[in-house]
């Protein structure tokens, strides 16, 4: 399942999360990433030692991330979605 940018924006909790997510929509921000028809996953290097492990279930539109954010979905999940929407070949 492929989500459009507009669909991703509607999932975001606020405009700041959209902006932060778009800032993470670069392959260089992700040390590992993968995709299937049903899910996206990746490791996003934050400011800490260990990258955040992010998963997006495309079938049920569900999110999981190891970051400490209280926003749902977090900027990492949104970033992974924006990256996939702009570059599904990655």
Give the ranges of each region predicted by the language model.
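Long, low-complexity, compositionally biased intrinsically disordered regions
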Residues: 1-90
């Amino acid at each position: 399942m492929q989500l459009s940018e507009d669909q991703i924006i509607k999932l975001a909790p606020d405009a700041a999360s959209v902006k932060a997510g778009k800032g993470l929509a670069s392959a260089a921000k992700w040390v590992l990433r993968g995709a299937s028809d049903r899910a996206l996953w990746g490791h996003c290097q934050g400011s800490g030692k260990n990258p955040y492990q992010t998963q997006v279930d495309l079938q049920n539109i569900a999110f999981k991330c190891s970051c400490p954010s209280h926003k749902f979905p977090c900027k990492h999940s949104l970033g992974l979605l924006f990256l996939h929407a702009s570059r599904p070949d990655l």
